[in-house]
Amino acid sequence: MTEYLLLLISTVLVNNFVLVKFLGLCPFMGVSSKLESAIGMSMATTFVLTLASILSYLVNQYLLLPFDLSYLRTMSFILVIAVVVQFTEMVVQKTSAALHRALGIYLPLITTNCAVLGVALLNVNEKHDFIQSAIYGFGAALGFSLVLILFSAMRERLAAADVPLPFKGGAIAMITAGLMSLAFMGFTGLVK
């Protein structure tokens, strides 16, 4: 049980996919201008990342490895992710049309979010079992959500602040992201 808790904490804080591994930067910068959109994207990405991790593990263990098709791993994981994203988009569209409009193009772009594919591939490379794969995917999603929501809240506050003209927009966003990354470096050594 302790091993699973350490894996979760490590994935959320110590090895955060956005601030440490630099995966998932497109939605991180693109959806973070409004808190409401960031929360919606966080929920959708959490669902997709967790489910894609589990399904990718199952595809790898019960389809690719037994038939010696490991060379199809990346393509099959992309297919799994695309199916999960399509399912998620249909659910979001049926349950919340406003959220679907707010997320816009970023919802289908979860398919190309490198963090989702990165989690699936890292699960295989680190030889996680089923439960570890699920926890790793969920932890990566929680870490992504935490960073996205915090960054979004800071960007909303910065939009209302008196920022010098050369720093407005993307420049101050990059500086803020860098400072967040430095803050998350403080968690290094928390989990070995």
UniProtKB/Swiss-Prot annotation:
It is found in: Cell inner membrane. GO terms for biological process: electron transport chain. It holds the Pfam family Rnf-Nqr. It is an enzyme of class 7 (translocase). One of its GO terms (cellular component) is plasma membrane. Its EC number is 7.-.-.-. The chain crosses the membrane at residues 5-25, 39-59, 65-85, 102-122, 134-154, 171-191. It is a multi-pass membrane protein. Keywords: Cell inner membrane, Cell membrane, Electron transport, Membrane, Translocase, Transmembrane, Transmembrane helix, Transport. The keyword Electron transport applies. It comes from the Bacteria. InterPro entries: Ion_transpt_RnfA/RsxA, NqrDE/RnfAE, NqrDE/RnfAE_oxidrdctase. Belongs to the NqrDE/RnfAE family. HAMAP family: RsxA_RnfA. Part of a membrane-bound complex that couples electron transfer with translocation of ions across the membrane. The complex is composed of six subunits: RnfA, RnfB, RnfC, RnfD, RnfE and RnfG. This is Ion-translocating oxidoreductase complex subunit A. It comes from Shewanella sp. (strain W3-18-1). The gene is rnfA.
